[in-house]
């Protein structure tokens, strides 16, 4: 199911689109690395299942897996994201306090439902930064979100300077709200509808504390219990005026420590994961305290370029019906 905006015409031809994609990605990557003190590193496309390093996302998505000839009997998985791998890399590389790493992450999410903003191909900047115990606060999380949002603003400014026909539309500041405050504000709406209404009102929002059970007995959304601390995480969401809908650009958070990992595994009935290598290191306090997240590259491009479909800024696979519908309505997929 996709949305076809009324009278949609992209302001960019296909080669202008490709050039603008490069401008956006280069500008954002450079700015992100500068404001968060990150160094680019190489990262894997796949990991061994037994390590527990793959990201379980919402806990139900199936990774693409295979066996390799020289390691028969060991299951290899295409990554969903690098949330856990990055934290291990910070330890291996000896990264200092308040310094971090980022990588170009490419993944396959086979169970994604295709629409204007979802693809089975995921490209994002995955980043992770070493923090102190005293940084494990909402205030530090919000400070980091503001730094990240400023990178969006600088990237938008660079795009507008290069392509005058492109108009700036992002608000100058981001609005913070917790998932509980959002539920209290709109108690009769579904979590997704709450996001829509609040994002449309504010333009740029960060919803914190996702994964925990709210006073209603429900969750705002599911989160895997073994990477984000559900009290210290959130989603950065911007309003997309072309699709007239909310668009999540980043999911991020302060990561679990020994206590929050144990608590969340218990709540999620996932204590069997304690035997995995990664979880053992965490429970023994052998990994640094960190904050990190993922930032959708194609989503940034489609939003800032005011594209109607993510396939206009990335090459992926779409259903025949979607391809035909897009072609009939002047939406040129790469």
Residue map of PLM features:
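Class II aminoacyl-tRNA synthetase-like tRNA-binding/catalytic domains
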Residues: 2-118, 126-130
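Generic recognition of stable, solvent-exposed alpha-helical segments in well-folded globular domains
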Residues: 19, 23, 27, 136-143, ...
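A general structural signal for short secondary-structure junctions and capping/turn motifs
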Residues: 56, 66-69, 91-97, 117-119, ...
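N-terminal pre-domains immediately preceding structured catalytic cores
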Residues: 41, 50-55, 166-179, 319
